[in-house]
UniProtKB/Swiss-Prot annotation:
Consequence recorded when altering residue 443 to L: Constitutively active
Domain NACHT positions: 163-476
Name listed for the protein in its UniProt record: NLR family CARD domain-containing protein 4
One Gene Ontology term, aspect cellular component: intracellular membrane-bounded organelle
Reported effect, residue 533 to D: Mimics phosphorylation; causes rapid macrophage pyroptosis without infection
Tissue specificity of this protein: Expressed by intestinal mononuclear phagocytes.
Free-text note regarding domains: In an autoinhibited form the C-terminal leucine-rich repeat (LRR) domain is positioned to sterically occlude one side of the NBD domain and consequently sequester NLRC4 in a monomeric state. An ADP-mediated interaction between the NBD and the WHD also contributes to the autoinhibition.
Binding site for ATP: 135, 172-177, 443
Organism listed in the record: Mus musculus (Mouse)
PANTHER family in the record: NLR FAMILY CARD DOMAIN-CONTAINING PROTEIN 4
Lineage: superkingdom: Eukaryota
Gene3D superfamilies in UniProt: 1.10.1900.50, Death Domain, Fas, P-loop containing nucleotide triphosphate hydrolases, Ribonuclease Inhibitor
An example Gene Ontology molecular-function term: ATP binding
Post-translational modification: Phosphorylated at Ser-533 following infection of macrophages with S.typhimurium (Salmonella). Phosphorylation is essential for NLRC4 inflammasome function to promote caspase-1 activation and pyroptosis. PRKCD phosphorylates Ser-533 in vitro.
Amino acid sequence: MNFIRNNRRALIQRMGLTVTKQICDDLFALNVLNNQEANVIYCEPLEQEAARKIIHMTMQKGSAACNLFLKSLENWDYFVYQDLTGQNLSYQVTEEDLNVLAQNLKDLYNSPAFLNFYPLGEDIDIIFNLEKTFTEPIMWKKDHRHHRVEQLTLGSLLEALKSPCLIEGESGKGKSTLLQRIAMLWASGGCRALKGFRLVFFIHLRSARGGLFETLYDQLLNIPDFISKPTFKALLLKLHKEVLFLLDGYNEFHPQNCPEIEALIKENHRFKNMVIVTTTTECLRHIRHVGALTAEVGDMTEDSAKDLIEAVLVPDQVERLWAQIQESRCLRNLMKTPLFVVITCAIQMGRQEFQAHTQTMLFQTFYDLLIQKNSHRYRGGASGDFARSLDYCGDLALEGVFAHKFDFEPEHGSSMNEDVLVTIGLLCKYTAQRLKPTYKFFHKSFQEYTAGRRLSSLLTSKEPEEVSKGNSYLNKMVSISDITSLYGNLLLYTCGSSTEATRAVMRHLAMVYQHGSLQGLSVTKRPLWRQESIQSLRNTTEQDVLKAINVNSFVECGINLFSESMSKSDLSQEFEAFFQGKSLYINSENIPDYLFDFFEYLPNCASALDFVKLDFYERATESQDKAEENVPGVHTEGPSETYIPPRAVSLFFNWKQEFKTLEVTLRDINKLNKQDIKYLGKIFSSATNLRLHIKRCAAMAGRLSSVLRTCKNMHTLMVEASPLTTDDEQYITSVTGLQNLSIHRLHTQQLPGGLIDSLGNLKNLERLILDDIRMNEEDAKNLAEGLRSLKKMRLLHLTHLSDIGEGMDYIVKSLSEESCDLQEMKLVACCLTANSVKVLAQNLHNLIKLSILDISENYLEKDGNEALQELIGRLGVLGELTTLMLPWCWDVHTSLPKLLKQLEGTPGLAKLGLKNWRLRDEEIKSLGEFLEMNPLRDLQQLDLAGHCVSSDGWLYFMNVFENLKQLVFFDFSTEEFLPDAALVRKLSQVLSKLTLLQEVKLTGWEFDDYDISAIKGTFKLVTA
């Protein structure tokens, strides 16, 4: 009792929570502590408080209890006991004894038993040698946010080693091999960072049992007799950081089996030995809080994969295999995981030719290898039972994929022969310290393959019941987003397993596109490639945008299924039904190999696509050479000097048919030579209808005319922020078949004979957009003259034109003085005058097909209100009006009553813009009353920016505003407006009811953090 009293402070500080609870177990078993007292200790989360309580309880029970306490302490924490009793035995181990132990470990780590290992498990007789097959991994240091902050090599990791060091990575990333390599380097004596360690222990945590001493004895070597367990513990305590533990596979470790190792990791500050632990990312959460250094094993580099292949295969096999990998981006991607490199090598072993072109082939070979290698281990059952067990394994995997389940309990396998599946390795059984065993597939992707294999067999079965069962699984896939995100791999392996199964899958996917859903909505027909900003999406709902993105992924999914199926042209009809009417986006810098097969074997499908978009970007010539080495049909001598990838030329020019529509975008290209232009011409020739977009291309100055000469079927041209010469502009106006022309941000001075002067030559032009172009009044007059000749024009945008004087008077007159078919007119920020508006009003009867009229961002000076009222009074002739965006002038708010009267006849209005109308409370109430009596049910955009409304006025308006259920965007911006609390609360309630909102502009509203928190939602909120 005196001993405990004298050492009470040290005991409280050093015992630790694990040891305290172990001592509590002993004292409870010996009836020193009763049930209530033991529960007090078990429920105490603080280690020092738990130690304080158990010491107090023990001392109250007398000397006998104290003696039992010390005996238990000696058993569970010998280090502390030896220190406190003054019986430290470290002196009993001499330097010579320590050297003998270290040499024994080094001999082990240099022995074939340690260096030779089974990369696919001991059941598969394929052996790799650590010295010859180890390749340097890429690792990433993680910060406290668990973000990657620094790339590490093995050497830099060891130099910066802190304990505990946690190494995370998914299965198959080579974590175990990494620890074995560290042990081998220590044994060799050639690693400077490891020379400070006197002892290094490599431990497989999955088979750790008993204490630390017993585990080392079982796994590594016979520890010399002169080193007893107490002596060994004292030795570890003495050496501190001179001992390194390499603990492999915490994800397979059961702490109950070896509490000392658990304490070595989680209470490392007590042991002070260095520890490196590997675990899967999923299990990292159990130990991340104690890690002093966390590193993630990343992807295997291409060079490392090649080194590994060269180390395990003979030279002629390496050459054939590497050639196949270089031809397939799919295989190159799989080679980032060491496990798949090993499987690929295993496939090649014993074969004359490498055949693994697909992911399915890799898994199929591995699956068959498991069956072949291990089926002989199954004894005592009929062959039919064996086959049924395999089928049930597939059913288990299939049900798991649909239930998103990857761990299985015994009840899930009630009708299967578990011995068969566990014996041959299809399932792994986990039983240690479990009331019920758990079954898992060795890898999530392998479960998906097993499921796909089973689904394929069901769909191609001769038994109607099995076919019906297979179709029932397909019928669960009714959402495009689910197919692309949840079931993509399942379908990939299904199609890779059977051509007939592919036929069934593609028929189902075609039906999903026609009749399926995305979050309960029918599939959109929007162009799939378009990634537009929120400003240009205000006519659409959020669901529309989401559907477009998912349908684009759907097309990519279809092409991947074609590639995986290796069906070539056998299923041409089924694939054509799937691709009919869809769109495809291609990045010229990343053209996958399967597209060449797609164009070659399914030309009817490529022709069935409505739209193909191809993008070109500026690129360095050095970076492209490697990508061009394997371009089919292209032979180059020396470094390439072209900026258009020959791979793109090969794909499009060698194709024997034509696309319906091809859109080519040239972006940020600063150099373009004659060969590039020739290449573009070859690509352009593959389309019946060509669209050419040029964005920020300095190389186009003086070369656009040459590029356009190669375009025989160009119907659309868009030029943005790219300088043009007079010759370029003249040639544009000579392309008489042009239907759509867009010019943006052209700041060069208009020269005689240029684009503006000759625009009238484009007789077939239907859409014209001129945005931010340098013009003067004389240029505007010439433009007006040219517009008279464009009789087929349906859309005209003239935006952000300055310094054109009264030029808009001439332009408006030329557009409206005769009856025409113009459907969309945008004259935004273009010096529109009151006279222009008057002319437009007087001639509005000639524009009766107008559905979009946007003349916003124009300030009408003299007689502006009169002109605007005249225009408003004649709006009734526009029976198809859906968009109305008006200019402003002095006292423009007085025109609101007349406007509201006219809007009674336009219930289909989708956009209304009254920017800078300086609406007051009176006007906003009038607008609210109008919307209450004449609800614009289709209104999607409302712009009332530049108002003078008070909080009371907005409160009144909000009661009606919340009924605009289709609203996508609104702008109520103003200057220095402080909304009161009641308005903020009401606004928050209204916004929560407008579920389709994408963007809200409230610039000038002086919100604090509480206000922002109340009104924010899934939409974009702009307040500054």
